[in-house]
Amino acid sequence: MPCEARPLSVKHYDYSASHIRMSVENSLLKLQTDYIDVLLLHRPSPLIDGAIVAEEFQNLQKEGKVKQLGVSNFTPSQMQLLQKEVSLTWNQLECSLTYEVPIFDGTLDHMKYQNIGAMAWSPLGSYFKENSIQKQRIQKVIVPLCNKYNCSEDQLLLAWLICNPSKIYPVVGTTSVKRM
């Protein structure tokens, strides 16, 4: 499959220039591709130096190895500090109907204002993992809607995210073979 037909994301944590480059080079080899669509800085670090990240990202971008830079699990203030040095295009964060924190704490508002895309990891949240009071409350609303719209619970949970004005892109996966 050609690179143009499959968006690729890569995550790493050590934010030194040499480690960023090594991570990109190793990922390109393992993925057998020429470039990465989005390089994600996987989580905030108190040791991150935005100038170093910016310079190495710009070098990799000039070389055609990376197209966009994003972050994962960064707060609005952490994104702002990094954006003083380099432009961010994505923040991958936990967001679901059972974990609405970024919707109400200003994170998605900040991202929308800064034109930073949102990717949601664990987009189904704890809905299928536990039988909590929260799940029971949500089920009272979702089950009738699933019947009305002839869809499954997971489809409706994903639709809830996708319909958000922040245009949240769910990152889906499973640890259960039966859910595939």
Where in this protein do the model-derived segments appear?
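Short, acidic/polar
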Residues: 13-31, 52, 75-81, 103
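Beta/alpha (TIM)-barrel catalytic core signal, keyed to glycine-rich beta->alpha loops juxtaposed to Asp/Glu
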Residues: 44-180
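Structural motif corresponding to the early beta-alpha repeats
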Residues: 1-17, 42
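Membrane-targeting and insertion segments and their boundary/processing signals
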Residues: 10, 31, 151-154
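Metal-dependent phosphodiesterase/phospholipase catalytic core, i.e.
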Residues: 4, 20, 36-38
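Active-site groove signature of glycoside hydrolases
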Residues: 28-47
